[in-house]
């Protein structure tokens, strides 16, 4: 879809614009290693699509979505570490700790996380948002990425917590909640926050279920091929939500997730 591709190009450009931290050269190189690789950018695209559907400024949504993408990439750096998933390849390239060393990768993730909030908190990076709205966006992202969100979900995962729904809602769904909620804040539609939080959670759950089906782990280990039917039910439920009916771009992004298994 042409509009999605345009947004994606703008997200790539914005990531390059905002990712200019200062510090030791090797640390900066490690911080940039994941975010500047070409990716799906599904999270910032959802942020922009929600903001657009609700009447928000697309440039501001691109800035916020790019920040969420940086948070996502910091989490990937840490997830790949030997003490977590111990992965050696990501996107066809050596993982951050393989290329830069374990200690540098750990520090790069830390620095990327803190730098993201430095960028997102600067008024000059936005066109239409008030200081109050910027503060709210930072609070939402901090909560959804933190101990009761993405990081908390990772803890449940490495501890072998059996409730896959709760693990997935926190580990994957929380950051999608942030995408949808921040889209509403950008659009100055705070009355939509609870609704967007709920929809974002379900989109994140759909994303995780599709991943598990393709990787044959997680939900697939519990449900087997029945998982495909559960995915279809959740997809059909989301399609009936008003915001998906009204936004061609949101439907397209939802289809991108679902069609990976069809």
Swiss-Prot record:
Alphabetized UniProt keyword annotations: Cytoplasm, Isoprene biosynthesis, Magnesium, Metal-binding, Transferase
EC primary class: transferase
Cross-referenced Gene3D superfamilies: Farnesyl Diphosphate Synthase
Residues the entry annotates as binding Mg(2+) 1: 79, 85
Compartments, record wording: Cytoplasm
Keyword presence, Secreted: no
GO BP: any one term: isoprenoid biosynthetic process
Annotated SUPFAM superfamilies: Terpenoid synthases
Predominant location: cytoplasm
Any one Gene Ontology molecular-function term assigned to this protein's record: prenyltransferase activity
UniProt: isopentenyl diphosphate binding residues: 40, 43, 72, 91
Catalytic activity line of the entry: isopentenyl diphosphate + (2E)-geranyl diphosphate = (2E,6E)-farnesyl diphosphate + diphosphate
Co-factor remark: Binds 2 Mg(2+) ions per subunit.
Binding residues for Mg(2+) 2: 79, 85
Annotated EC: 2.5.1.10
Protein origin, superkingdom: Bacteria
Positions contributing to (2E)-geranyl diphosphate binding: 90, 171-172, 208
GO cellular component: cytoplasm
Cofactor or coenzyme needed: Mg(2+)
Family of the protein in this entry: Belongs to the FPP/GGPP synthase family.
Listed name of the protein: Farnesyl diphosphate synthase
Source species of the chain: Aquifex aeolicus (strain VF5)
Gene symbol of the encoding locus: ispA
């Amino acid at each position: 879809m042409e509009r999605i591709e345009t947004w994606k190009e703008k997200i790539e450009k914005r990531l390059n614009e905002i990712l200019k931290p200062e510090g030791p050269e090797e640390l900066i190189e490690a911080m940039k290693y994941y975010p500047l690789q070409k990716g799906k950018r599904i999270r910032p695209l959802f942020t922009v699509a929600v903001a657009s559907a609700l009447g928000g400024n697309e440039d501001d949504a691109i800035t916020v979505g790019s920040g969420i993408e940086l948070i996502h990439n910091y989490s990937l750096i840490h997830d790949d570490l030997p003490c977590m998933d111990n992965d050696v390849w990501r996107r066809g390239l050596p993982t951050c700790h393989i290329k830069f060393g374990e200690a540098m990768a750990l520090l790069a993730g830390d620095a990327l996380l803190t730098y993201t909030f430095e960028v997102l908190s600067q008024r000059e990076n936005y066109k239409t948002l008030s200081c109050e709205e910027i503060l709210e966006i930072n609070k939402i992202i901090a909560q959804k990425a933190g101990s009761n969100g993405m990081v908390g979900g990772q803890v449940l995962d490495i501890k072998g917590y059996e409730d896959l729904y709760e693990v997935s809602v926190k580990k994957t769904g929380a950051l999608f909640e942030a995408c949808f909620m921040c889209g509403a804040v950008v659009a100055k539609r705070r009355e939509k926050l609870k609704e967007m939080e709920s929809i974002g959670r379900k989109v994140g759950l759909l994303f995780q279920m599709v991943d598990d089906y393709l990787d044959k782990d997680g939900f697939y280990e519990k449900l087997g091929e029945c998982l495909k039917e559960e995915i279809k039910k959740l997809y059909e439920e989301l399609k009936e939500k008003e915001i998906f009916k009204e936004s061609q771009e949101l439907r397209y992004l939802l289809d991108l997730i679902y069609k990976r298994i069809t």
